[in-house]
Amino acid sequence: MLRLHKFAALGALIGCLVAGSAAAADKPAPPDAATQEALAKDAKCTTCHDKSWPQPVLSIYQTPHGNRADPRAPTCQSCHGESTGHQADPAGVHPDVVFGGKDDKNVSSVDLRTSTCLTCHQTGLRMHWSGSVHQTQDVTCTNCHSVHTPHDPVLAKVTQPDVCFACHKTQRAQIHRISTHPILAGEMTCSDCHNPHGSTGPKLLVKNSVNETCYTCHADKRGPFLWEHSPVVDDCTNCHTPHGSNSSPLLKARVPWLCQECHSGDHAAGINSGANLPGGNATTINGVLPLGSQNPKTQLNARACLNCHVMVHGSNDPAGAKFQR
């Protein structure tokens, strides 16, 4: 029994060593630790960049980047370079790395600014950054992130959409339509569906497909179903527009017009006809009543396919081939 315990202890020790080495390999070497040297490096900058500076420079110490109790926290030079020329001549020489707006003539190149952040932020959500649509469109980290502010707006659910809408103006307009996701209410945000740092799916979606992303919340629509509706299986956006619509619930067009994009001709009733509705067209001794007749209940105008076909996402009822139950 004693030998067994020794082997178990040895196995646990080896496991810890392997796990520790793997974890270390996943992380880049941390920047300067919270030492007097690190504080001295910061002091070279904060001597001038103090509370009187127009930008909120010192507030970085209220963020994880400025937490001197964390050995991973960078110094000013970790991000802006040693900038010895700038220290010697602040007015005449700009820092080695300048994170500024596009109108700043001294701003560093997109690649230099991005690579500076990626020195530490390499894994996790950033692993698909290279080749992503934001990367290829020369979007840099500081276009979205406010590193020196205590509360980065893009990381808060309530304020994140405003950061995204600075560029995505069409989507800003769409969320003000009648039927929308609860973005304005602060109950969800852009990154619930999109990963702005890159993705294996289309449109920077957090999952590999549109449907898998939608099923994250709408699990009841996932299936599998005994009777499947092919456009639903193919892509939710065949019928829905995710950012907002004036046809509820987030439909691309009103029913029955939406349905008739596929179900036209002999496959379903026309909007001005009662053909193929239960009971068919009303008839008199002289034949079929025309449009505007005294029997409007057999016409499809102002009626919805969903009145009868209530299970359009799929049905598990043995008699649900027409999605009526």
PLM region descriptions:
Residues 20-325:
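Short sequence/structural segments immediately N-terminal
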Residues 1-6:
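Positively charged n-region of N-terminal signal peptides that target proteins for export
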